[in-house]
């Protein structure tokens, strides 16, 4: 049937039941093999919308050219703030089942960022290898960062579900192999495999939430995801410490198998996404940005590898470390330049960096997450190294932080849904985080525990405002067809900021402590048990030195947060407006895997 025969008018229109068409404000809707909701984001001026703007032709579903879409979007944006009508198709899902399954999957992937931190001494002792133990955590973070740029591209080529299943498979496989590891090298390699899946899961869950929810109600669900993410990062050291003290450290990884299996089964059965035309292998070879992907991943790994080696050895002028940093930086710059001119689906789409608002959002998210990961990593270290807490008690003392973060992540999602604007929330979050980091500068070795716990909640209060709004703002800045790429790009830049933050914090801490002890690096590596066994006079000196090193870290964080706050002024405010209309459910026997059909 010709697509031109399917247009109806909302005002005084006649419904053609035989053709199975519905119409809203002149926008013709087709029945598909999957139930969906039409979500329209109306503009200030009405424009004629073709049927292909709503349901693309089957032969062109996967020919998404980010550059063309973003160029048209930028031209329209320059003429008016919201001068075009963006259409989003929303599949019907049982949100009471799908959302908890996605949350559990995200929680497990996020948990593995920090769950090993309190178990590192035990694992190192078991394998009799302390020199490589830091790579247990670094391997996961490096692999997670490396896979993020490719997630959005693979989603547009293969579809969300297939990519999600692949990522879950790698995460579960890596978890099983980590639990069965017999030496340190085995464990580190398997942590990298686990990280490939974990990084993809974290990005994909956010992408899928944006696919199954309209923009105006999305903050509520995204707020729940942000709560799960923040809670996992804070709960990781507690759970890891408890497992190590009650049973073997191997259950830190084995625990993912039954939990992940349940979540995967629910996702397979209950998650419904819009049909996706499968691309041919020939078309995949023609459109995928292989050069950009290889350069980005290699560049990231080399940069973080160089920073990590420099931090652990303290010898930044070594030839190998300088080569890692220089070559990695050159590859990353080359990838960005290449993606600016390539006609393929770029791994780092230039429009996200050329658009002033989206570039500011990327900077805002990166600076915040750099501080958040430093905070989440070094506050438990303060409790252990200076206050003498064991891993469990250190986690207990961070419970107020976790409670504040979870409460405000959820609350901000609901407020954002009601308010319809994200910029005021970002301002509140950044101001609170700058104040919280500034207050932490006053903490020393003798500060009362209640005061320390109170000051830490100030930063966590602000953090609750900064997980979700930048993501929603990024999605609102571009058309729905670019949502997956926008989400993946923000997640990649944000996570990379966190990875760099942890490494820079390690550099600051090691350098400060080493200088205080005349170049002796031993004191920077002491565990809380070893500190408590030192002679009283030396113990006091070591703790004061640690407190001084932490103070330098908090000063660094405060400066970075202030720079991030300046980037907010370049973010463009957009109202989150959407209208939804249900379309008849799919017929019996229809499959979600089939592409949309004309009727």
From Swiss-Prot:
It is found in: Membrane. GO terms for biological process: basic amino acid transmembrane transport; transmembrane transport. One of its GO terms (molecular function) is transmembrane transporter activity. InterPro entries: MFS, MFS_dom, MFS_trans_sf. Residues 14-27 have a biased composition (Polar residues). It is a multi-pass membrane protein. One of its GO terms (cellular component) is plasma membrane. Residues 44-70 have a biased composition (Basic and acidic residues). PANTHER family: DRUG TRANSPORTER, PUTATIVE (AFU_ORTHOLOGUE AFUA_3G08530)-RELATED, MAJOR FACILITATOR SUPERFAMILY. Belongs to the major facilitator superfamily. TCR/Tet family. This is Uncharacterized MFS-type transporter C16A3.17c. It comes from Schizosaccharomyces pombe (strain 972 / ATCC 24843).
């Amino acid at each position: 049937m010709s697509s031109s025969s399917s247009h109806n008018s909302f005002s005084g229109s006649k419904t053609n039941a035989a053709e199975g068409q519905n119409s809203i404000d002149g926008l013709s809707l087709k029945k598909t093999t999957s139930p969906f909701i039409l979500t329209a984001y109306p503009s200030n001026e009405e424009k004629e919308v073709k049927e292909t703007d709503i349901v693309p032709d089957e032969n062109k579903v996967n020919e998404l050219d980010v550059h063309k879409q973003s160029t048209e979007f930028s031209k329209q944006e320059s003429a008016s703030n919201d001068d075009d009508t963006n259409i989003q198709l929303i599949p019907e899902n049982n949100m009471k089942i799908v959302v908890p399954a996605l949350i559990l999957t995200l929680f497990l992937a996020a948990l593995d960022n920090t769950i090993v931190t309190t178990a590192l001494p035990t694992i190192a002792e078991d394998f009799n290898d302390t020199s490589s133990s830091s790579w247990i955590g670094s391997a996961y973070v490096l692999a997670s960062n490396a896979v993020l740029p490719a997630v959005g591209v693979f989603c547009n080529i293969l579809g969300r579900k297939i990519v999600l299943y692949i990522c879950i498979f790698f995460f579960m496989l890596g978890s099983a192999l980590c639990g069965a590891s017999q030496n340190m090298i085995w464990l580190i390699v398997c942590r990298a495999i686990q990280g490939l899946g974990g990084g993809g899961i974290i990005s994909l869950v956010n992408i899928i939430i944006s696919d199954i929810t309209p923009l105006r109600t999305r903050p509520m669900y995204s707020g729940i995801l942000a709560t799960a993410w923040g809670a996992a990062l804070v709960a990781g050291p507690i759970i890891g410490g408890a497992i190590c003290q009650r049973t073997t450290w191997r259950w830190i990884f084995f625990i993912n198998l039954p939990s992940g299996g349940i979540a995967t089964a629910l996702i397979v059965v209950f998650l419904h996404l819009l049909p996706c035309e499968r691309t041919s292998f020939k078309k995949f070879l023609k459109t995928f940005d292989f050069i950009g992907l290889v350069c980005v991943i290699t560049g990231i790994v080399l940069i973080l590898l160089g920073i990590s080696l420099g931090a652990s050895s303290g010898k930044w002028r070594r030839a190998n470390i300088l080569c890692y940093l220089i070559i990695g930086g050159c590859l990353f710059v080359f990838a960005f330049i290449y993606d600016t001119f390539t006609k393929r689906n770029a791994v780092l789409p230039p429009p996200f960096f050329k658009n002033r608002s989206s570039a500011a959002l990327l900077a805002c998210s990166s600076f915040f997450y750099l501080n958040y990961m430093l905070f989440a990593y070094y506050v438990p270290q303060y409790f252990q190294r200076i206050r003498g807490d064991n891993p469990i008690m250190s986690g207990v003392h961070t419970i107020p932080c976790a409670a504040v973060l979870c409460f405000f992540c959820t609350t901000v999602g609901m407020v954002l849904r009601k308010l319809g604007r994200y910029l005021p929330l970002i301002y509140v979050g950044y101001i609170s985080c700058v104040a919280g980091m500034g207050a932490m500068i006053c903490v020393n070795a003798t500060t009362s525990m209640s005061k320390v716990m109170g000051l830490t909640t100030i930063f966590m209060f602000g953090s609750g405002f900064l997980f979700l709004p930048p993501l929603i703002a990024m999605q609102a800045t571009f058309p729905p067809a670019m949502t997956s790429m926008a989400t993946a790009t923000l997640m990649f830049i944000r996570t990379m900021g966190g990875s760099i933050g942890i490494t820079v914090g390690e550099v600051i801490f090691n350098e400060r402590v080493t200088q205080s002890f005349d170049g002796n690096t031993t004191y920077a590596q002491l565990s809380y048990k070893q500190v408590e066994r030192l002679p009283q006079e030396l113990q006091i000196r070591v703790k004061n030195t640690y407190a001084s090193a932490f103070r330098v870290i908090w000063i660094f964080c405060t400066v970075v947060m202030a720079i991030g706050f300046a980037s907010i002024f370049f973010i463009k405010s957009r109202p989150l407006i959407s209208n939804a209309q249900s379309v008849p459910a799919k017929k019996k026997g229809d499959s979600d895997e089939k592409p949309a059909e004309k009727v």
